[in-house]
Amino acid sequence: IPKMPIMQYVGEQKNAPKIFEFFPSHTEDSSFELYEDDGETNSYKKDVFLKTKIESKFTSNEMHITIHKPVASGGYAEFEKKNYLLKVHLDEKPSIVLLNSRKLKKSKAEKLLNDISTAYDITGYVYNEDNKTLHILLPISDENLEITLMY
């Protein structure tokens, strides 16, 4: 489920994170395309937009999330520094979290959320035991992002 912070008007938070909330299925793969335009003009009528494909799948002991490189159409130029925040609802805590085959560092919740709209070179994750939710912070990239949760 794509989300964003609550704002009083379009563009209030220039570098607001893109939030994706996952309720993964153990039996079905899922995917969707996030469509974005500038939110202010009629440029979308001229096919000026950005699309980002997101996929997730489960295997017996891993969950895989792929955020594909955003694809611009019609000269869409807005590729600002922003972060992705993934909120993944899980039955159990993963033992390892990987980003493009590299182990991510565990963070403190306050640090992760404080950096969400100001730091664009930080990656990390935190698991909330109370609501069984894994939060992963990643900078938006011009490459595919492969997230692997191992159990």
Model regions: which residues?
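Low-complexity, intrinsically disordered segments enriched in Ser/Thr together with acidic residues
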Residues: 140-151
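Catalytic core of carbohydrate-active enzymes
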Residues: 1-95, 99-102, 107, 129, ...
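Short beta-strand element of the conserved SAM-dependent methyltransferase core
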Residues: 54, 125, 148-150
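Generic structural detector for well-ordered beta-strands
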Residues: 87, 135-137, 148
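Extracellular/luminal ectodomains and secreted, surface-exposed scaffolds of diverse proteins
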Residues: 102-142
